[in-house]
Amino acid sequence: MGNEFRVCDDCQATNVKTLIPKLKKVDSCATIEVGCQSYCGPGRKKSFAFVNNRPVAAPTEDELIVKIEAKLNK
């Protein structure tokens, strides 16, 4: 089973236009779902994505990608 990324296109700290290409570089075969994730509180302040149904957040997109890569390499 492949990885799954879920991101919000409405949260203030998440820029879907730049985040999705970065996620595709991490795993080009992953499923990417865009839409409200009901994670609005943290989503106002931090960039985030759900990785295989687990939330991962960081102050910047680049830090988020590092955390996602670490999570997938466990």
From Swiss-Prot:
Disulfide pattern: none
Top-rank taxon: Bacteria
InterPro entries registered for this protein in UniProt: DUF1450, UPF0741
Family: Belongs to the UPF0741 family.
Record protein name field: UPF0741 protein BA_5632/GBAA_5632/BAS5234
